[in-house]
């Protein structure tokens, strides 16, 4: 990595090659790793300027922190409802969810979170990608009507489910299945939403719950978020099945201005 002063340093790129958005020659914003930590590099990549110049919050931990900040400020109330408390990594039965929210009446909302960094492209367009990453093209017409959509997940089909089905993220498929099971067992007693992990104390819970998923679209150039069969067939099967069973899917967009993140509203989802 060539720094602004011309020197060269090693930087860690976490999260499965940052979703394929970090390519040779890309501009990045770095954070300095703490001395004496477990990482072997002095820096970690936090933001990447994707093709077109849009800053992407590609580091996985950014999504968690942004979701926590949005919840603390009440910015997700339109999707998740108002709440008076938020507990992170709460255990519900055999599943540990990212958030457990509670409203003034004691009704709970269970929340799981997914960070979204990749987008689709107009058909016929080209952009560099690391080996093994393919562009996901829009299913809609090109031209002035094209509106970029965020896509989750994007990556190599290098993981497998228990039945041997290949997928991009076994963890994501597992979470959607678990949320669907919660929704099936809920009986409408408790709301459950999936948004993104943040820090905080864990708490064991046992009540039944419904379920939902909220994607954090960590780039400001997308107008919706989609689970595409062309990027991960396994999740493209499980997500609509979960939605039909009562799992709600929500999304919000983050727009970056340098190192500052701005909440940029809720987005429609397509599962």
PLM features: residue spans?
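N-terminal targeting/trafficking signals and adjacent low-complexity tails
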Residues: 191-193, 199-200, 210-211, 218-271
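Terminal, basic amphipathic appendages of nucleotide-handling enzymes
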Residues: 22-24, 28-73
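SH3/SH3-like beta-barrel fold
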Residues: 1-3
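A short acidic/basic microdomain associated with nuclease active sites
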Residues: 75-94, 98-100
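Conserved RecA-like P-loop NTPase helicase motor core
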Residues: 166-170
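Conserved catalytic cores of phosphodiester-cleaving nucleases, focusing on short active-site segments
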Residues: 97-161, 165, 179
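Beta-strand/loop nucleic-acid-binding surfaces
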Residues: 6-22
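Metal-dependent nuclease catalytic cores in nucleic-acid-processing enzymes
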Residues: 28, 173-192, 199-211, 243
């Amino acid at each position: 990595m060539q720094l602004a002063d011309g020197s060269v340093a090693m930087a860690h790129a976490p999260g499965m090659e940052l979703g394929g958005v970090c390519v040779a020659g890309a501009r990045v914003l770095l954070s300095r790793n703490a001395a004496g930590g477990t990482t072997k590099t002095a820096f970690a990549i936090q933001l990447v300027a994707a093709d077109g110049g849009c800053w992407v919050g590609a580091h996985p931990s950014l999504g968690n922190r942004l979701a926590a900040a949005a919840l603390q400020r009440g910015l997700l109330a339109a999707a998740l409802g108002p709440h008076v408390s938020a507990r992170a990594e709460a255990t519900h039965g055999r599943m540990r969810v990212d958030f457990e929210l509670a409203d003034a009446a004691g009704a709970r909302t269970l929340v799981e979170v997914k960070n979204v960094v990749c987008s689709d492209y107009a058909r016929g367009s080209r952009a560099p990608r690391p080996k093994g990453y393919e562009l996901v093209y829009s299913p809609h017409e090109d031209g002035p009507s094209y509106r970029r959509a965020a896509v989750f997940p994007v990556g190599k089909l290098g993981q497998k489910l228990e039945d041997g089905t290949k997928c991009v993220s076994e963890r994501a498929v597992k979470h959607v299945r678990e949320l669907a099971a919660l929704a099936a067992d809920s009986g409408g007693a408790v709301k459950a939403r999936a948004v993104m992990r943040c820090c905080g104390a864990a708490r064991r819970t046992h009540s039944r719950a419904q379920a939902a998923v909220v994607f954090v679209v960590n780039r400001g150039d997308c107008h919706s978020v989609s689970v595409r069969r062309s990027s991960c067939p396994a999740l493209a099967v499980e997500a609509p099945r979960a939605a039909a069973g009562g799992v709600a899917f929500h999304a919000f967009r983050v727009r970056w201005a340098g190192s500052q993140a701005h909440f940029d509203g809720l987005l429609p989802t397509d599962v």
